[in-house]
């Protein structure tokens, strides 16, 4: 039996995600972000609900990325997620992209020239943003040109780096329908951004969310729910530069701006510069919200849910892979659990996110 892996956020799970699962072969393992997303925002619905959505539409096993993998730049996000899939025995990584290239060949380039490529990035000017450095590297070594308007392609290149040396094969699938940043909807597909913006429109939800009833019943949150807490964290923290990835310049810019803004969006606009992209600023604000500090990643894999086939596979691998299926007194990952506690503060109706929760099972 072949084993396919997918790296996902499912924020929320829509028809494009269902299509990608349908293209994957064999046992389908999804490593999914928890309650905070790669670009620095809370998930619209919680991780358990999103895991159930995936399991209802073809996933066999859904496991969780730790917070410090989930909320990271593309390369770190990809590397951490692929490490989890590799431990679980995944043979092929299936992913959507706007650009259908020979990503396996690109991965081979990185295998051959990784040290040279990383040194090239280190020697680029400090005023280059991380995406600019990445784009310059791929243009220099692979002749690729692209912009920030193709985030799935950027992630695909990060996956090409991440699988180097693992033996995992890359299996790209042409992205269907609306672009990642698009707020437009098409006949069969809409972007997650469009769905989040139209979350209160029942026709939109029912047309583009395969698990529409689950989504309708779930407690929904956005940055708006957390802004008062974020403002409190910023104004009372004794030294913001002690928070993960917050340097003195960012700390100063954030403190200077917080008194004159009323939303997270306004704060992001005020802090963003050519060097500090909006995505980086949102991630930094997420770290401040959680009061994140750098901690080692957990060795064990946290299981969010499985099908009968997925459960049978877990029994096969449990002797060689540390698995966590219920968090009690012993923590799995203290920072992820801290993030879950903060996430729960977003709404009174929010369900417990960590303690005593057991994997979702879908037959």
Swiss-Prot record:
Q: Does the keyword S-adenosyl-L-methionine apply?
A: no
Residues binding ATP are 7-20, 96, 152, 175
Q: Tell me its EC number(s), please.
A: 6.3.4.-
In which broad location class does this protein mainly occur, judging by the first location in its UniProt entry? cytoplasm
Fetch the InterPro entries from UniProt.
Rossmann-like_a/b/a_fold (IPR014729), tRNA(Met)_cyd_acetate_ligase (IPR008513)
Q: Where in the cell is it found?
A: Cytoplasm
Which leading EC class covers this enzyme? ligase
List the catalysed reactions: cytidine(34) in elongator tRNA(Met) + acetate + ATP = N(4)-acetylcytidine(34) in elongator tRNA(Met) + AMP + diphosphate
Q: Does the record bear Cytoplasm in its keywords?
A: yes
Alphabetized Gene3D superfamilies for the sequence: HUPs
UniProt GO cellular component terms: cytoplasm
Q: Name one Pfam family in it.
A: HIGH_NTase1
Which biological process, per GO, is one annotated for this protein?
Answer: tRNA modification
Keywords, sorted A to Z: ATP-binding, Cytoplasm, Ligase, Nucleotide-binding, RNA-binding, tRNA processing, tRNA-binding
What Gene Ontology terms describe what this protein does at the molecular function level? ATP binding; ligase activity, forming carbon-nitrogen bonds; tRNA binding
Function, as annotated, reads: Catalyzes the formation of N(4)-acetylcytidine (ac(4)C) at the wobble position of elongator tRNA(Met), using acetate and ATP as substrates. First activates an acetate ion to form acetyladenylate (Ac-AMP) and then transfers the acetyl group to tRNA to form ac(4)C34.
Q: State the family it belongs to.
A: Belongs to the TmcAL family.
NCBIfam families per the UniProt record, alphabetical: PRK13670.1
Q: Which HAMAP family match?
A: TmcAL
**UniProt protein name:** tRNA(Met) cytidine acetate ligase
Give the organism the record lists: Streptococcus suis (strain 98HAH33)
Cite the source lineage: Bacteria, Bacillati, Bacillota, Bacilli, Lactobacillales
